[in-house]
């Protein structure tokens, strides 16, 4: 079993690896122990956001120097999930997850944090947003749970996926082979990819039966969702990266995790209740929180708590950017700062207009 350490480090630019270098050089983490890095980069979070790819490349190169591996080999052993968009008060940062063998001499009472990773195969352009992506993701989630030593779905608290999107070149490739992509709108393809990935998580966690999952389910049947899913689409990969985070009696981490679901983009009360479930009940105790991870979206019916919003009809700013700013501010108002992980686009991730979240804290 494992001992998990988690570090949140600020970023001064998308290519900034100084925080990671400092963790390694001061001996706080061994480079070989790093299994995942989740980051918020200061791009637009849309199709042409290359800050995600740049950040991943720089982090992989940094770790590669310490591991004496080429960057592409680092990306095969470390799950990199870069989420673009730090609108509003959101602050660019990385969350580094390190995993080493459990420390039997210091085994705490109760369940503690554990984490596992897995990767799907590369997807053909015509598979993105469809049943193939759903089933492949479900299989990867189960492998990540086994990798983490999470024995029961009840002990699973958050599943993070990084998934691909469609580009004009990918669309042309599909058509050249006589295949039709799920959409020809590259921005819309992000939603399809996130949605299919989320439904794959729902299949793995038994929140949705396989009989209800067909191509047409994605972005159509909003009754289908996962309360544990967080999916982020990007231009920098062709497969899905999966991180499963939960708890285990055998884990020896000093950390714990709890999760909840925001009913809408401003549901700070749910975040507060989940934090309190970890025994954090005052502002003085907020420093126990390592990070909060959340999904956010503009309510697709155009209404928040009975009042009309204009996030979906703004021709200048994509709705995912609005949603990140709103939910980022709501969570920041609870924890007291904006260095939290909020990802836009919550298709099939929690209720329409809301989204799942998780809190990692020191026990």
Swiss-Prot record:
Homotetramer. It catalyses: cyanurate + H2O = 1-carboxybiuret + H(+). It is an enzyme of class 3 (hydrolase). Its EC number is 3.5.2.15. Keywords: Hydrolase, Magnesium, Metal-binding, Plasmid. Optimum pH is 8.2. Residues 1-104 are annotated as: RU A. Residues 112-249 are annotated as: RU B. The monomer structure is formed from three repeating units (RUs) that share the same structure as one another. The monomer, the active site and substrate all possess threefold rotational symmetry, to the extent that the active site possesses three potential Ser-Lys catalytic dyads. It is possible that any or all of the three active-site serines may act as nucleophile (albeit only one can do so per catalytic cycle). The active site is at residues 162, 232. Inhibited by barbituric acid. Pathway: Xenobiotic degradation; atrazine degradation; biuret from cyanurate: step 1/1. Belongs to the cyclic amide hydrolase (CyAH) family. Pfam families: Amido_AtzD_TrzD. It comes from the Bacteria. Substrate binds at residues 52, 83-84, 194, 232-233, 324, 343-344. Residues 255-363 are annotated as: RU C. This is Cyanuric acid amidohydrolase. The record marks 320 as: Important for substrate specificity. The keyword Hydrolase applies.
